[in-house]
Amino acid sequence: MPTVKQLIRNARQPIRNARKSAALKGCPQRRGTCARVYTINPKKPNSALRKVARVRLTSGFEITAYIPGIGHNLQEHSVVLVRGGRVKDLPGVRYRIIRGTLDAVAVKNRQQGRSKYGAKKPKK
């Protein structure tokens, strides 16, 4: 327990909340370059091969980002736009790649939830 004199000399520091997406540096999205594109297995009750990419951001961070949707065209040196948003069954994956921008093409034949995958409205 500090004395009153110690508290006058050095006030208590407020506890700061940690940012959930520190690599974005307060921006809504960041551009980055894929360093590696690979698959990983999800946590226990789930089973799949989830597509992820190791991305070097313009903020200087290297992060693991999830590639949403069915099928993708990403490879090493692809330029992508990254947003925050974790994937619950992939530990350490706290970012997602935005489909339909830069080098990440939109998901084909997507009818519902198109805005999340960069898909255009289908012609009638």
UniProtKB/Swiss-Prot annotation:
The keyword Cell cycle does not apply. Keywords: Chloroplast, Plastid, Ribonucleoprotein, Ribosomal protein, RNA-binding, rRNA-binding. SUPFAM superfamilies: Nucleic acid-binding proteins. One of its GO terms (cellular component) is small ribosomal subunit. It is found in: Plastid, Chloroplast. GO terms for biological process: translation. InterPro entries: NA-bd_OB-fold, Ribosomal_uS12, Ribosomal_uS12_bac. Pfam families: Ribosom_S12_S23. GO terms for molecular function: rRNA binding; structural constituent of ribosome. It comes from the Eukaryota. Part of the 30S ribosomal subunit. With S4 and S5 plays an important role in translational accuracy. Located at the interface of the 30S and 50S subunits. Belongs to the universal ribosomal protein uS12 family. NCBIfam families: rpsL_bact. This is Small ribosomal subunit protein uS12cz/uS12cy.
